[in-house]
Curated annotation (Swiss-Prot):
Localization in the cell: Nucleus; Chromosome
Composition skew (Basic residues), residue ranges: 204-213
InterPro entries registered for this protein in UniProt: SPOC_C (IPR012921), TFIIS_cen_dom (IPR003618), TFIIS_cen_dom_sf (IPR036575)
Cystine connections: none
Principal place of residence: nucleus
Subunit composition and interactions: Interacts with DNMT3A, DNMT3C and DNMT3L. Interacts with C19orf84. Interacts with SPIN1; promoting recruitment to transposons marked with histone H3 trimethylated at both 'Lys-4' and 'Lys-9' (H3K4me3K9me3).
Stated name of the protein: SPOC domain-containing protein 1
Annotated ranges, domain TFIIS central: 608-728
PROSITE patterns documented for this protein: TFIIS_CENTRAL
Acidic residues compositional bias, start-end: 581-592
Amino acid sequence: MSQAGDVEGPSTGDPVLSPQHNCELLQNMEGASSMPGLSPDGPGASSGPGVRAGSRRKIPRKEALRGGSSRAAGAAEVRPGVLELLAVVQSRGSMLAPGLHMQLPSVPTQGRALTSKRLQVSLCDILDDSCPRKLCSRSAGLPERALACRERLAGVEEVSCLRPREARDGGMSSPGCDRRSPTLSKEEPPGRPLTSSPDPVPVRVRKKWRRQGAHSECEEGAGDFLWLDQSPRGDNLLSVGDPPQVADLESLGGPCRPPSPKDTGSGPGEPGGSGAGCASGTEKFGYLPATGDGPQPGSPCGPVGFPVPSGGESLSSAAQAPPQSAALCLGASAQASAEQQEAVCVVRTGSDEGQAPAQDQEELEAKAQPASRGRLEQGLAAPADTCASSREPLGGLSSSLDTEASRACSGPFMEQRRSKGTKNLKKGPVPCAQDRGTDRSSDNSHQDRPEEPSPGGCPRLEEVKIPHGVKLVCYLGSGPVIQLLGAISHGQAGGQLPPKLEVLEDLMEVSSPSPAQRLRRKKRPMVQGPAGCQVFQPSPSGGTAGDPGGLSDPFYPPRSGSLALGDPSSDPACSQSGPMEAEEDSLPEQPEDSAQLQQEKPSLYIGVRGTVVRSMQEVLWTRLRELPDPVLSEEVVEGIAAGIEAALWDLTQGTNGRYKTKYRSLLFNLRDPRNLDLFLKVVHGDVTPYDLVRMSSMQLAPQELARWRDQEEKRGLNIIEQQQKEPCRLPASKMTHKGEVEIQRDMDQTLTLEDLVGPQMFMDCSPQALPIASEDTTGQHDHHFLDPNCHICKDWEPSNELLGSFEAAKSCGDNIFQKALSQTPMPAPEMPKTRELSPTEPQDRVPPSGLHVPAAPTKALPCLPPWEGVLDMFSIKRFRARAQLVSGHSCRLVQALPTVIRSAGCIPSNIVWDLLASICPAKAKDVCVVRLCPHGARDTQNCRLLYSYLNDRQRHGLASVEHMGMVLLPLPAFQPLPTRLRPLGGPGLWALPVSPLLSPGLEVTHSSLLLAVLLPKEGLPDTAGSSPWLGKVQKMVSFNSKVEKRYYQPDDRRPNVPLKGTPPPGGAWQQSQGRGSIAPRGISAWQRPPRGRGRLWPEPENWQHPGRGQWPPEPGLRQSQHPYSVAPAGHGFGRGQHFHRDSCPHQALLRHLESLATMSHQLQALLCPQTKSSIPRPLQRLSSALAAPEPPGPARDSSLGPTDEAGSECPFPRKA
C-alpha cells in the first residue's frame, strides 16, 4: 500500500489521558465512515476534503480537529445503529474481517452529533477506569487489552514507527523493542482535547492508527500506546495497555489467546488482540494454517490463521467475536477462492544469528494470487515479525494496515532481537506484531510498487494452490530434527465442521514401536477464543527452538486422533463478552525423541512380564484349589506370582532367553503334581522368590526323581567297582585303521608278568642252586610234557654217562629237550594245586602266585644280553636296541644276529604262523622270541615309530638276516603272548614277582612291545658252545587235559619184537647205558644218537612190520605219521599237543617187560671193557662208532631219522 508520509516527532503525554491517543481514537472512530466499504452510499455521506485511504498526504492537526468536529456534526446522516456499532467496536477493540465492505445506509445529519457524543462518553469511561499505577498490568474493571495508558513515563519520547530504510538510516529500533511507543506526528501538541473532525481528519488518523497498530512493544513497554484488543465483553479489538509478560503459542498462529490470570499485562498476542506476540529471543515463526470453516452468522472471520472459505476473503490471524449489532451481519461472497481455502503459511524456526532472506519474501509474494474485491490484494505480502502474525483488517476502523508500517516494525525489531538474544525470552516473550488489514479501496496504486524487504523479514503468508491429492502438512523444524505435526484434513475443508489435523507417523524416530506398543499421545489443552476458534495451549514456560511448548512450538503435534481447531457456531463461549481463561493445569511437556524412546522402551517388556505373572498366578491358584483346605486368597497368590516374576526379572535383567528358560523351568516344576513339596514351600513362604529363581534343576526336581537319580548314580559306581575287582577276563581291544577292534582271549591263555622297563635277567648256572626232585611224576605223564621226574619221559634222553666223552667235545645244549632233561626238575606237588582253581579261572592258567620260582642265589652272576646292535627299518632312523629273551631256551639264533639289522619288507600275520608250522621239529628247538629294548630316549622314540608303523597296518616286519629268518611282531599293551609262541617255553613276559599292591587275582600288564621271532635256516653256524644259558633252569610247561588229546591206534603198527634173548633184526634195539633200559631205535624221534657218518645197524629201505606191510607211502603223511613228530599247527603245534601213536615208548615198554628184564644182565656184561671181545656185533659197531673221530664241519641233526652209507640223512618212513 502507498502512504503519503510518516509524521514523526516527539510529544509528551498527559499523565491522566494521552491527548494524542484520545484524539487519534476519536478521529479513527469518527472516520470509520470514510473507509472503503463503510462509507454511505449517498453522495453526502462524508464531508470535508476527500482523502483516500491509502493517501500519504499530511494533514495538520487543526485540520484533523475540524474534520472531527464536522464529522460529529454530520453524524445524523449515519444510521444510529451503525454509529452504535462503531462505538461498540471502538470500545471493545474488535476487528472486522479484512476487506469486509459494509454497505451502510444514509444516516441523518442530526444523528452524528449524538453518535460522537456517545463515543466520547464510552472512551472517557474506559480511560477513567484505568489508573496510572496500572500501566503494566490489567485493570480489573476494564476489559483485557482494552487499556489506555493515561500517563507516560518521565523522560520517554514518543516516536513514530519508521519504515525500514528510515530505521536503518536513523539507527532507531522498533517501537515495541526500544521501549518507545508510536505517535501520530511530531507536530502534535502534548495535550489535545477530544474533538471530532468530520472530513479529512479521520483518514489521517486512521492511517496513523494503522501504523501504530502494526507495531508492538517489548516486555517492559515504558510508553503508553494504543493496542487493538478486546472489550470487556471480549469482542472489541481496541485496547491501550502494556505488553503481556508471557507470550503464548497462539500468538504465532493468530492473536487468539485468552489472557491467563497469571498474565500481568495485555498485548496483541492474546486472543482478541490485533497484534501478534513478539518474541525478542532467537525464534522466527510462521505457521501452516489449514482451511477455515465457513463464516457463521455474525462472524465474518474464520478460525485463527485460516482464510474464510465462504465470504471471508482475507487470512485472519485473530479470531473475532460476533458483533453485538445486527448491522454487522452482512453477507459476503458465497464461496472463497481455492487459493484462499488452501493458503499455507509456512512456519520456520530460526536462530538469533540470522534472519530470513529477502528472497523468501519475494518468493512468497510471487506465489500470492491476485484477488478481486473479495480476495486478497495482489502483492499483499507484509513481512511478519518474529511471531509472524497474520494480516487482519480493522474492519470498520480502517480500510487496511500499511505495509510500510509492518516492515518498519519488523526490520528494526529484528536488530533489537539479535542484540538481546534469549534474555528477553526468559523474561517472557512480548508480542510486538499487530494484525494488519488490507486496503479494500478501489485505488490500488500501491500494488504496483514493489515492496522493500525488511532486513529481518519473517516468512509471510501466501496463497498456494494445492493439487488434488496433496495434503497440507504442518511440521516443526528444530535444527537437524524435523517433527511432523499433522496433515490438514481436506474432507473437512469445505464443510461446516472445523478442520482437523491428522496424525502422521514420525519417520525420523530412531525406533518406532508397533502401534499396539506405542504409548498413547495426550492431547494438548485447548483454549477457546472469542470467535469460537480453538488454539493449542502451550506450556506456561517459554522455551527456545529445542524446548517443546515454548515459542518454537506453534502447533504442538497432536499425538492421537484428529484435533479440531474450532467451531465458532457450536461453541457457546463465542457469545460470551468476557475473555476465556486458559486452564492453568496444563499437561507436562512432551519429551524429545531420545527421552520418548527411553519412556517407550520399558513398554516392550510389559507384554512378556504380564504374561509370566498371569501364568504363574494361574498355576499357583490351580494347585492351591486342589488342596483340601486352601489357606490363601487369590490376592495373596497374585502377590506371590508377582514377587516371583520380579525376582526373575532382577536376576536376568531382561526378557531374554535366560529369563524364558528359567520361567519355563519354574512353571513346569510348580505345575508337576509329583512335586508337591516345592509347591508347599513356595506357598507357605519357606522358599522366598529370591531363592526360588536361583535354585538349580536338581533342587527344583521332586524328591522321587532325586532319589532315582541317586540310585542310578550308585548303581553305575558299583558296576565300575565290580569291573575293576574282577579278573581281567574281558576281551582286550586295540586301535586299528578301522577303529577299535576287540580281541577275544583264549581260554587256555596264561597272562604273564613283565617288567615295564625291561630289566636285565639274572641267572645262575651253578648246580648248587638247583632243587632236588622229591617224587615221581610218571603217573601224571598224560598231563605234562618232558617232565624230568617222569620215568617215561626220562627214557628218551641218552645217558650223560654213556655220552660223557662225546659231550665233552660237543655242545651238550644243542638240544633244548636234552638240556631240560639233564636238569633236575622243579618239585611236582605244586602241580595239582594249580588245577584246583575256581571255575571262573581257566584251568590251564597258572597265576604267578601258583608258580614256583626258584630261590634266588646268594650271589647272582649277571649275564650280558645275548645281543646288542642297531636296527634300520623302513627308512626310519636307526636305533640301538638290545635283545631280551621272552620265549625259547636256545640263544644260538640270538647270538648269531648281526650288529646291524636291515628291513626286507612286510608280510601278513598269517604267513608267520605258516612259517612256524613248517619248521622241522629238529630245528624247532632253536625257535625263540626276543624283545627289542631301545637304549636311550631318542632310540625309544624311533622304536615307537616302528611299532606304530607295523601296528597300524596290521603287518609284521621281515628282516634280512643270514642263516635265519627274523620277523618283527608288534604286541599291543595289555595283550598276552600269542598262544602259538608259548609252547616254546622260556621266561615269558613275566620277569619280576607280583607287586604286593596288586590283588592276587590281577596280573601286571605291559606296555606296547616290539618282539622279534627268530626262525632257524640251513647252514646256521654253531655258536651254542658259548651260550650263557647252559645249565639254566627251564620253565615247565603244562597243559590242560581238556585241550590235550591222545589218539591210540590198534597194535597193527607195532614193530616186530624179537624173541626173548635174541637181538632185534637189523639192529632195531638200542640199549641205554645209564639206566639199563632198552628202547627201539626207530621209536624215539627226539633221541639223538652220537654224531657219525654211518648207521649203527643196517636198516632196510622199507621197514616192514611182520604181516602188516610197509609204512604208508604218501609223502604228505610222512611227517604226521612219524611216531614222535610234532603235529601240524592246526592240531598240536600251536597248542602244544603231542599225539601218541601205537609205537609210543609207553606202549612199547608195557609190551616188552619180559624182554627188558632178560637183556638187562647182558647189557651190564657188555659195558665192562674186559669183556669187549665178547660183545655182540651190534654193540661192537656202537663202540667203534663212539671211538671214531668226528669229521670237521657243522654237526648234522639226525633227529629225523637214520643216515645212509654216504652220511646223508635218511628220513623215515621212506616211500618204496
